[in-house]
């Protein structure tokens, strides 16, 4: 079963995703964040301390289909947090050292879509419950920069693909989860 949990920043989506897991004794937590500065290091440490000790944590943001596969114990639950951070990391990885104004966003989106399609296929083959957390990016103003506009567009299309493939979709607003699929 594939479940997508979406919502704005600080909406309570992580808490809601963890509630969907319940008291499962076998959890694979896939963290997609990278430590790029002190503020992000503090955020990651805060999340680490909040997780139960028995959760198995893997910090990775590429080739996630290799972690989510048909050999996973059906009693295990997979929690991937967060898809939007994964998309951000992929964008900057594909962009390399080039100036973002020189990036080939169409080629980048194709590469990201290939990664997302592999992730979806893995989730659908996986016998365990897979919960994906993502940010709802399309409810704000039109971003000022080219990079931010492309990011919003790519992340929005990724979310649409995930929602279409998911068995359940939850939108979390102000700490309240609303099942929309």
Swiss-Prot record:
Induction: By cobinamide. The keyword Coiled coil does not apply. One of its GO terms (molecular function) is cobinamide phosphate guanylyltransferase activity. Pfam families: CobU. GO terms for biological process: cobalamin biosynthetic process; DNA damage response; porphyrin-containing compound biosynthetic process. The active site is at residue 47. Gene3D superfamilies: P-loop containing nucleotide triphosphate hydrolases (3.40.50.300). CDD domains: CobU (cd00544). The keyword Ligase does not apply. Pathway: Cofactor biosynthesis; adenosylcobalamin biosynthesis; adenosylcobalamin from cob(II)yrinate a,c-diamide: step 5/7; Cofactor biosynthesis; adenosylcobalamin biosynthesis; adenosylcobalamin from cob(II)yrinate a,c-diamide: step 6/7. Its EC number is 2.7.1.156, 2.7.7.62. It is an enzyme of class 2 (transferase). It comes from the Bacteria. InterPro entries: CobU/CobP, P-loop_NTPase. GTP binds at residues 7-14, 31-33, 48-51, 59, 81. Keywords: ATP-binding, Cobalamin biosynthesis, GTP-binding, Kinase, Nucleotide-binding, Porphyrin biosynthesis, Transferase. It catalyses: adenosylcob(III)inamide + GTP = adenosylcob(III)inamide phosphate + GDP + H(+); adenosylcob(III)inamide + ATP = adenosylcob(III)inamide phosphate + ADP + H(+); adenosylcob(III)inamide phosphate + GTP + H(+) = adenosylcob(III)inamide-GDP + diphosphate. Homodimer. Catalyzes ATP-dependent phosphorylation of adenosylcobinamide and addition of GMP to adenosylcobinamide phosphate. Belongs to the CobU/CobP family. PANTHER family: BIFUNCTIONAL ADENOSYLCOBALAMIN BIOSYNTHESIS PROTEIN COBU, PTHR34848. This is Bifunctional adenosylcobalamin biosynthesis protein CobU. The lineage of its organism: Bacteria, Pseudomonadati, Pseudomonadota, Gammaproteobacteria, Enterobacterales. The gene is cobU.
């Amino acid at each position: 079963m594939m479940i997508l949990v979406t919502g704005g920043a600080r909406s309570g989506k992580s808490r809601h995703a963890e509630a969907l897991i319940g008291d499962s004794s076998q959890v694979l937590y896939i963290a997609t964040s990278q430590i790029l500065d002190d503020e992000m290091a503090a955020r990651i440490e805060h999340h680490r301390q909040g997780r139960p000790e028995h959760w198995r944590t893997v910090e990775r943001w590429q080739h996630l289909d290799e972690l989510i596969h048909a050999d996973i114990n059906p009693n295990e639950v997979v929690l991937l947090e967060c898809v939007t951070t994964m998309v951000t990391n992929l964008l900057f990885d594909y962009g390399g050292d080039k100036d973002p104004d020189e990036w080939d966003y169409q080629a980048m989106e194709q590469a990201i879509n290939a990664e997302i399609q592999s992730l979806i296929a893995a989730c659908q083959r996986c016998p365990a419950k897979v919960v994906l957390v993502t940010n709802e990016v399309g409810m704000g103003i039109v971003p000022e920069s080219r990079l931010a506009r492309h990011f919003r567009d790519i992340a929005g299309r990724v979310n649409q693909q995930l929602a279409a493939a998911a068995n359940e979709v939850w939108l979390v607003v102000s700490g309240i989860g609303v099942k929309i699929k």
